[in-house]
Amino acid sequence: MAESKCPFKSQGSRSNVAGGGTRNTDWWPEQLKLNILRQHTTVTNPLGADFDYAAAFNTLDYDALKKDLTALMTDSQEWWPADFGHYGGLFIRMAWHSAGTYRVFDGRGGAGQGQQRFAPLNSWPDNVSLDKARRLLWPIKQKYGDKISWADLMILTGNVALESMGFKTFGFAGGRADTWEADESAYWGRETTWLGNDARYEKGFSGSDKQGTVIADEASHKTTHSRELENPLAAAHMGLIYVNPEGPDGNPDPVAAAHDIRVTFGRMAMNDEETVALIAGGHTFGKTHGAAPADNVGKEPEAAGLEAQGLGWQNSHGSGKGPDTITSGLEVTWTKTPTKWSNQFLEYLFKFDWELTKSPAGAHQWVAKNADDIIPDAYDAFKKHKPTMLTTDLSLRFDPAYEKISRRFLENPDQFADAFARAWFKLTHRDMGPRARYLGPEVPGEVLLWQDPIPAVNHALIDTVDTAALKRDVLATGVNPSKFISTAWAAASTFRGSDKRGGANGARIRFAPQRSWEVNNQPWLQESLSALEGVQSRFNASRPDRKQVSLADLIVLAGCAAVEQAAHDAGFPVRVPFTPGRMDASQDETDVESFSHMEPIADGFRNYAKPYVHGRAEHYLVDKAQLLNLSAPEMTVLVGGLRVLNTNYDGSAHGVFTSRPGVLSNDFFVNLLDMNTAWQAGHNGEIFEGADRKSGAKKWTATRADLVFGSHAELRAVAEVYASADGQRKFVNDFVAAWNKVMNLDRFDLQGKQFIYPRL
């Protein structure tokens, strides 16, 4: 009988089916990509548009779930045995690595979307074996279904792991709804090899194509004590969460490693004390795995065959599991009680002198000199080992600032436990945004500064009669309405859908650091705020019925009033929706350093860019639009509207393609697409001049963030809709809808459902 053959032969990634072949990005790698504006919509969500995760979570039998998770910790499975009979260390690492991708500059990364399930994170070298952790969790996820997301479950499991080993956690908040596709918006770096860092650092390491170990670059780099990490990255190597545990580029120098630790943890919003607490606390538990060289480790999950069913890194050494496990390539157990909370990590750190050695996989690590064999083996009860440490562990002793904190924690175990509990909570909740999003019975009562607290509403809210009167008062102040639009936009557009920070609520635009940001044009901002504070003061003083208006509400209302006036002047009267309920935060409730990372380096909506920006304005525009949860049509209509409303940050005429600035017309699109205008690039390729094709008379000036709507084929297609003879009404309506969306992105108090404004 002839041999049976599978009819579907592998054709690689470029097969002759839909999505295969040579793609646009192959022909034009620098083409502006709009795909990040089309992600995470209801189309990709199998639970449907009406699914309300918050409501589902609130029906969860939370105590039963925690009991099941606690039981799992010691239910060792033959297919992936538990170190020391306890999965605690593995699940702490899973939760840490889910949350630890967060970075302060753009708020991307973090645990909030459950992205560890998808590429590239599911295949990063730093996440070896976490595929097994999630599979161990699957029966519990399967049992509780939609009531607990993967994003929440991974973090809660880390908490339960800590509690099951005797540690008292600070609390837990649910509310992380899953996404259903890989997030394409995060910039993870430009390196094309695992563990490379030659793009993020001026003198870095080229990386490797090997899996399952941290590769050491034996070259001595003098810059490792002071090198600058590319923004917005918060990891020292492609495919690592933070730093190379062997030391910078694999060089076992604890002092140089401290520099990388301080930078990477700082970019994850952690100060020195939180950093020491996290490293020392996390390394109280479990072990690392480096039983043999990385040559024994197979393909990562995304490269493995179908038969692997999403698992990767098949290990050919011995049994490939248990005592034969290869994960980081390091073989370190820090304490003699790796399944119990203790102070032993810090005790051993200072008790012993340490000498450099190598793991069975060939990775640099450290062993205690002249120490007894006191560390248990993970699988052989009759076997003991000498204490071992990572290069980055020793940084806590040999960096002067870290040492001071470490010794204080050593002498004050209660301080250490409290610091670790708080730092762990911050690590795992940093990207959740305000407390209004927190769900569940273990939400801590203490309000923390990094949560950007806003006072609860403590007065009666204004009604439609009041809003109408306030709008009249605002427009009667004599301030150019464009400045009210600019102020409202400046306040609301600080929102980041990535970590749910920013927005108009709190009126923090009147405080440091936002009030002095160049993009906010402080003189104009102050003029607008002073006028609004006067309106607010007069209104609040005149009300005997406890009705008050917050400045945060008034900033948004003033912008809405100005937009309505501009639409009326265009001949299309419209009502801009407004919902009161915002409150005013104080300067003391504003973490200045934390908010300083949110200052835009470019904002195409206001034609702003810092002089040292290396990227193209149109790319930064799309980046900003994605953070605002905007679609391509929403981005398009907002830019076109803001230009004719004359809201450029510096009052320039770039992109103001109209003879009637301040009127909400579709002139931007009409004039941009006018073939009677010929464009010429300036000397720097950032500013352009448009002249009449026949006479050569200068007509307009523009930036890249303006002309992209006529240059980019997909954006031009949208622009044509608004430039059409019947497009004015649609333009006004769509602008108002998109404006309202941005003004309310941070109104989680209104979002009883898992709320996402519809995209145009």
Curated annotation (Swiss-Prot):
Disordered: annotated span: 1-24
Catalytic residues identified in the record: H97 (proton acceptor)
PROSITE patterns: PEROXIDASE_1, PEROXIDASE_2, PEROXIDASE_4
Keyword presence, Nucleotide-binding: no
Annotated site, Transition state stabilizer, chain positions: R93
Keywords on record: Cytoplasm, Heme, Hydrogen peroxide, Iron, Metal-binding, Oxidoreductase, Peroxidase
Record's signal peptide: none
A single cellular component GO annotation: cytosol
A GO term, aspect molecular function: metal ion binding
Covalent link Tryptophyl-tyrosyl-methioninium (Tyr-Met) (with W-96), residues: Y242-M268
Position of the Tryptophyl-tyrosyl-methioninium (Trp-Tyr) (with M-268) cross-link: W96-Y242
Primary localization class, coarse: cytoplasm
Domain of life: Eukaryota
Catalytic activity from the UniProt record: H2O2 + AH2 = A + 2 H2O; 2 H2O2 = O2 + 2 H2O
PTM description: Formation of the three residue Trp-Tyr-Met cross-link is important for the catalase, but not the peroxidase activity of the enzyme.
Binding site for heme b: H283
Family the entry assigns: Belongs to the peroxidase family. Peroxidase/catalase subfamily.
Physiological role: Bifunctional enzyme with both catalase and broad-spectrum peroxidase activity.
Subunit (UniProt): Homodimer or homotetramer.
Name of this chain's protein: Catalase-peroxidase
Protein encoded by which gene: katG
